[in-house]
């Protein structure tokens, strides 16, 4: 009873298409795709900026303790 079968998924998909329509779903899919692209681009930009800042850091002079 709690299992999700392919038949149940198809019925749910058909109901979603009936409620929203194909044009609205296409628009929603395009918006979702562009949002994911933007997120991935931001993540890659963040990684490259971290790498650049790590390369630009100059190591500090070593301090030795004299007794």
From Swiss-Prot:
Q: Name one Pfam family in it.
A: TatA_B_E
Which cellular compartments is it found in? Cell inner membrane
Residue span of region Disordered? 43-67
Which Gene Ontology cellular-component terms appear in the entry? TAT protein transport complex
Coiled-coil zones:
none
Predominant cellular place of this UniProt entry's protein: membrane
Q: Which GO molecular function entries does the Swiss-Prot or TrEMBL record give?
A: protein transmembrane transporter activity
Biological-process GO terms, alphabetical: protein transport by the Tat complex
Q: Where are the transmembrane segments?
A: 4-21
Q: How does it sit in the membrane?
A: Single-pass membrane protein
Q: Which InterPro entries is this protein grouped with?
A: TatA/B/E, TatA/E, TatE
Q: Which UniProt keywords apply?
A: Cell inner membrane, Cell membrane, Membrane, Protein transport, Translocation, Transmembrane, Transmembrane helix, Transport
Q: What does this protein do?
A: Part of the twin-arginine translocation (Tat) system that transports large folded proteins containing a characteristic twin-arginine motif in their signal peptide across membranes. TatE shares overlapping functions with TatA.
Return the similarity comment.
Answer: Belongs to the TatA/E family. TatE subfamily.
Its recorded name reads: Probable Sec-independent protein translocase protein TatE
Q: Which organism is it from?
A: Enterobacter lignolyticus (strain SCF1)
């Amino acid at each position: 009873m709690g299992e999700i079968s392919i038949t149940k998924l198809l019925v749910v998909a058909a109901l979603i298409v009936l409620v929203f329509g194909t044009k609205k779903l296409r628009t929603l899919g395009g918006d979702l795709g562009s949002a994911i692209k933007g997120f991935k681009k931001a993540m890659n930009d963040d990684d490259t900026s971290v790498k650049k800042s790590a390369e630009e850091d100059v190591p500090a002079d070593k301090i030795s303790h004299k007794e």
